[in-house]
Amino acid sequence: MTDSSFDIATAIADVLARNVTDVVLCPGSRNSPLAYALLAREDLCVHVRIDERSAAFTALGLARVQRRHVAVVMTSGTAVANTMPAMVEAHMSHTPIAVVSADRPSRMLGTGASQTIWQQGLFGRYCTTQHVESIADVEALSFAADQVHINVALDTPLVPEELPRRAGQAERAPVGPGRLDTAPAWVDHGSVDVDLERDTLVIAGDEAWDVPGLEYVPTIAEPTAPTPFHQVHPLAARFFVQSEVAISHDGGDFSASTKPEQIIVVGHPTLHREVMSLLEDPDIEVIGLSRTETFTGHPTRTGSRVNATGQPRDSWLKICEAAGEVGAQTVRDALADAAFGFTGLHVAAAVADTLGVGDTLVLGASNPVRDASYAGLPFDGVATYSARGAAGIDGTVSQAVGAALAVQALHPDEIRAPRTVALLGDLTFLHDINGLLIGPGERRPGNLTIVVANDDGGGIFETLEVGADSVREDFERAFGTPHGVDVERLAGAHDVAYHRAETLTELQELLVETTANPEPVTVIEARTTRATRRELAQRLKK
């Protein structure tokens, strides 16, 4: 006897309740048995979104904070394909996610039936499909991989004669961040010996963690990495590529050998070309530490832990401190130079100045995450997230919403939801404006501020090779891409609060005001210029 679609959907909901706490559900006909079964569960938090692409990124934002699988459920056809960008980012950033797609019965494949595509294997190398046609298939499902695709063939009838009974325990205790027992464990690559008497620099990127034994080693940390004890500004990298430089420190001038003998890479750094170029220096030994199956670059030795001996030399610590201070002062001087006007870097600095312990920060993957790095992040007590897996701007508004929902769920008894701030460029904001499309009956963020550094186009291209004067004739059309969108009207259309800042002082005042008196969702548009971004980038590299 063939299992009914309702029995299969109920079994799927049971499996999800054992492996996830949150489900993002999209409307559709073919997945209606799944919708009924999931909405009947009192031990699952269901969020409804009408756009599958945004839904998948909302799930990804939830998962980044929770550090466990979050499911996104949709109907058949291109609805499934719309989750591909989020699946790619999840794979590249090792973030758990589960796509649960409804499918047509196999007899309908290749017949031209509506909303029928080949969904099995749709995600290719990024995720293996687990196909379900029966209860027995459901019982064999596994969440052992970070990325899960459950493809469920559902036949008619798709609507039950009566609604299913409530299932699960509504009083289920909230689960804090951390992988459930069914989720995959970190990969252990063993230990690597490290002599810290050699001049050592740590470069910590996304997915980095506090490595025992490296606590007091000078570290260039990207904003999504833990805050190191000896934090070195990324602009110091220009000193580390040289064998010897003249440095002023503590009132004295001296020459010093500034090239590290070894670099330890923790996690997945990507942000700064000058920093990444150190990994290609043949005079520097590179050691890679990872808790996943991938390593950054081509390290000569790899592991997940260190057996550290010796201590960093005092002279090396002073060199790193001096180089880092030069980098930080370079940024301060540039911010104080009125010739650059009001730029995205100024916006990042203002946001950084208002961050407090317990805040959550989501950074756009283009200029904002780099500007935040120059502004001094990471900060202790501020959980920072950015899409650094594939490093695309896709779905950042949705991820910010998901992160805010996850954070406030951890503090259900607080009168005011914890503060979440998203710093985005205008193109990143516009690219995922559907992230603000939340139904009136759905859970909404309670304290999310989205700061949009709006320079009317692709500001990052101003700093890249395509922004050079010699090839600039068609720059605005192909790369600058001015849009002239009225952000205030967009915010109003999505029923969120809106403020505009034309100057740094106005932005600072708005950030203070919205921190003290937050709306559920607030968009602050900072009207910036990109006309000086190339000159600003050149100033920072001097």
Positions of predicted regions on the chain:
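Active-site diphosphate/adenylate-binding microenvironment
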Residues: 9-13, 26-30, 34-35, 323-417
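Glycine-rich, anion-gripping cofactor-binding loops and their flanking helix/strand elements
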Residues: 60, 64, 75-76, 82, ...
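Phosphate/pyrophosphate-binding active-site segments
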Residues: 1-4, 165, 267-270, 274-367, ...
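Structural motif
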Residues: 26-28, 75-76, 133-135, 151-154, ...
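N-terminal cofactor/phosphate-binding cores enriched in small/glycine residues
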Residues: 3-73, 81, 375
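Thiamine diphosphate
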Residues: 89-90, 100, 106-120, 376-542
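Structural signature of the thiamine diphosphate
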Residues: 19-22, 64-76, 80-82, 89-101, ...
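Conformationally flexible catalytic loops at phosphate/diphosphate-handling active centers
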Residues: 6, 30, 41, 140-197
